[in-house]
Amino acid sequence: MRPRVLVVATSRKTRGGITSVVKAHETGEQWKKYHCRWIQTHRDGPAWRKLWYLVTALIEYMVLLPWYDIVHIHVGLRTSVDRKWIFAKIAKCFHKRIIVHFHPATEKHLFDSEFSGKIKQLFECSDKLLVLSPQWVTWINQGSPDKPGGLSI
């Protein structure tokens, strides 16, 4: 039996690169092949809407997680990491395999002192880390050289 994949990413209604990537995957045959399900964690708008999306995503995630094998987390920087870190920690508690697909807009805040702890924890709990380019591999290896999981472009 093929593994089932929960995809944790921003909403379909949010503009941006992560949404575009997940929508593209959703149209591919691998989406059905691996029984993928999109957990929408964030939507642009007022604070109440953002909180609503996060809370409903956490509830949906907790209900579905026991029936899935892999959690594929799409993450940018800053608040995206704060949200997605929660999902990764829960997945680890359930002994799920975790893929972190890292696509931030810039490396500027990648390893700021206030931010680096959480991003490193997210990377370290992943079984596989996907990045957008060879340059990202270099930056991540400079900031987190002991990454235990595989790092792929």
Identify the residue ranges that each predicted region occupies.
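Donor nucleotide-sugar binding/catalytic pocket of nucleotide-sugar-dependent glycosyltransferases
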Residues: 124-153
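N-terminal subdomain of nucleotide-sugar transferases
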Residues: 1-43, 95
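A short, histidine- and acid-enriched strand-loop-helix "catalytic/donor-clamping" loop
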Residues: 76-80, 96-113, 128
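Hydrophobic/aromatic residues located in beta-strands of well-ordered beta-sheets
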Residues: 5, 36, 98, 129, ...
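Membrane-proximal helix-turn-helix segments that form the acceptor-binding/catalytic region
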Residues: 87, 93-94, 112-128
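A short, charged, and often flexible helix/loop element on the N-terminal side
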Residues: 36-62, 73-84
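Short acidic/histidine-rich motifs immediately flanking catalytic phosphotransfer sites
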Residues: 66-71
